[in-house]
A protein has these predicted regions:
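Acidic/histidine-rich
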Residues: 101, 108, 213-265
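A conserved active-site cap/scaffold subdomain adjacent to cofactor or substrate pockets
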Residues: 194-225
Length: 265
């Protein structure tokens, strides 16, 4: 099964995937969207793809927020009250919790896109998490966002590159050892021939992602490790006496600038 067949199969068999796409399609050009995402590599890559998706599909601007805590709270959402009412709140890569329904008291439409094991299922929020009801493990939220873009017909090379990075960041596959989560394999087989240079294996210093073979690494592993360090950049401020922006925002803005060039490193 190739990647496009996997996306089509998921659309046929997973009603949550279909509902997520219908939610995006239901937005208008003047819609306001707020996205809370995890602050790790997978979360920042997901935030970028969601921002990119909404801009490309409907010309919709998205406010992206990546709080330091994993679980989203009602207070986090309330802090954006001054921004007015949002038409859609997307919670990406921040877990699936039953009490996320509390957020619906202040946000009329909530879509959760996540790949973690659910800690109870919300009844009001819309949830796209292939792990719900003990279904297949989805490997990375970035991949789920890329699948939505693919079904909408708006994914391109920069999205492929960012998705590969997000998948590597959450250990969906290992370029050096060849190990790969089954759910991510169709994407890996699709993206490898499209961007072969990032899958090059080199005999250089191993990265944090080289857990199987410490004698070599891959270009994608090196890039992802740099991005991981970028998400932590704000923690270096005291050591270097610098005013460094919040790491996840720094990385997201870099991705946006990268997408505007139409090229990747």
């Amino acid at each position: 099964m190739n990647y496009f067949e996997q996306v089509e199969r998921l659309y046929r068999e997973n009603s949550d995937f279909k509902h997520a796409i219908e939610t995006i399609k239901g937005l208008g050009k003047k819609s306001k969207v707020l996205n809370f995402s995890h602050n790790d590599v997978d979360g920042v890559c997901s935030a970028f793809l969601l921002k990119r998706m909404l801009k490309k599909y409907g010309g919709i601007e998205t406010i992206s927020v990546m709080p330091p805590d994993f679980k989203l709270t009602k207070k986090d959402v309330e802090s954006f009250g001054k921004e007015g009412r949002f038409d859609l709140l997307i919670v990406s890569d921040k877990g699936t919790f039953e009490d996320y329904d509390e957020i619906c008291e202040i946000a009329s439409d909530v879509l959760i896109i996540d790949h973690h094991q659910p800690q109870g299922m919300p009844k009001i929020c819309k949830v796209f998490n292939p792990r719900s009801d003990n279904k297949e493990y989805a490997a990375a939220t970035t991949l789920l966002c890329h699948m939505i873009m693919t079904k909408l017909g708006i994914s391109g090379e920069i999205e492929d590159f960012i998705c590969a990075m997000g998948c590597r960041g959450d250990f969906a596959f290992d370029v050096v050892s060849g190990k790969c989560q089954p759910f991510a394999r169709p994407f890996l087989e699709y993206v490898r021939p499209k961007i072969p240079e990032i899958f090059e294996i080199v005999k250089e210093k191993p990265t944090m992602f080289d857990t199987e073979d410490r004698t070599k690494t891959a270009i994608l592993h090196k890039i992802t490790e740099i991005v991981h360090a970028g998400t932590l950049a704000h923690l270096y401020s005291e050591d270097f006496v610098l005013d460094i922006p919040y790491g996840p925002d720094l990385v997201l803005n870099f991705f946006i600038e990268l997408s505007e060039t139409g090229k990747y490193p």
